[in-house]
Design a protein with these regions (language model features):
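A structural feature recognizing the 12-helix transmembrane core of secondary solute carriers
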Residues: 1-213
Length: 213
């Protein structure tokens, strides 16, 4: 029998998921280092972050029905896309370091950090928010606060860790950091995925239940 506790089934998973995906906003910490390592201008690499935010919105808009139907599936999609995109970004940074000025490396970073991680961001944001609202239906302000807290804490917690990794990993530290973080965030998000669950017996209202509108 599954544990039915709003903190275990909603709050903790939300923090695990949001503290992971919220690190997308740490881009400014390492964007210049990526640009220098792969042989492009900082302006060229900045598009990766722009694409990530764009696809965050697009995936949230168009994959909302997946979240509504099955948050367990959507949270798994989020974990796979976010961690996979981060690992892929690390690979193309490594490739760009070995082939300075390679357009393939730059496009690979756009796809991995921008598109793949962007999809993980959108689904990863919606999945716990939906669940929080169900578990904390009488305290929606608290539910919203918990969701925002995870995003806000992500950069504050991850920024010094990322900087320490960059300083300690030496040559090629930038791509090594992405590989390490991909593993860490996958574990965090997968645990969140396993814990995340709607209240037992809850079903999405049908059109008839919602009434005319």
């Amino acid at each position: 029998m599954k544990v039915q506790n709003k903190w275990i089934r909603a709050a903790i998973p939300a923090l695990l998921l949001h503290c992971s995906i919220g690190t997308v906003y740490c881009w400014s910490i390492f964007s210049q280092e990526i640009a220098d390592y792969i042989g492009f201008s900082k302006g060229a690499t900045e598009w990766a972050f722009s694409f990530a935010i764009f696809f965050l919105g697009m995936s949230a808009a168009f994959l909302g029905n997946v979240v509504e139907k099955d948050i367990h599936r959507s949270s798994l999609i989020a974990a796979l896309c976010f961690a996979g995109g981060m690992a892929g970004t690390g690979f193309f940074i490594w490739y760009g370091g070995n082939n300075p000025g390679s357009v393939l490396a730059l496009i690979g970073i756009y796809i991995c950090y921008g598109f793949i991680m962007g999809v993980g961001l959108g689904t990863g944001y919606l999945s716990p928010v939906k669940t929080l609202m169900l578990w904390f239906s009488d305290r929606k302000g608290l539910a919203t606060g918990l969701a925002v807290a995870g995003f806000g804490a992500a950069k504050a917690i991850a920024s010094p860790i990322m900087q320490t990794l960059l300083d300690s990993l030496g040559d090629g530290g930038i791509y090594k950091m992405f590989f390490i973080l991909a593993c860490v965030y996958f574990v965090m998000m997968f645990v969140g995925h396993l814990l995340l669950a709607k209240p037992e017996g809850w079903h999405e209202p049908t059109g008839a239940d919602k009434g005319p509108g």
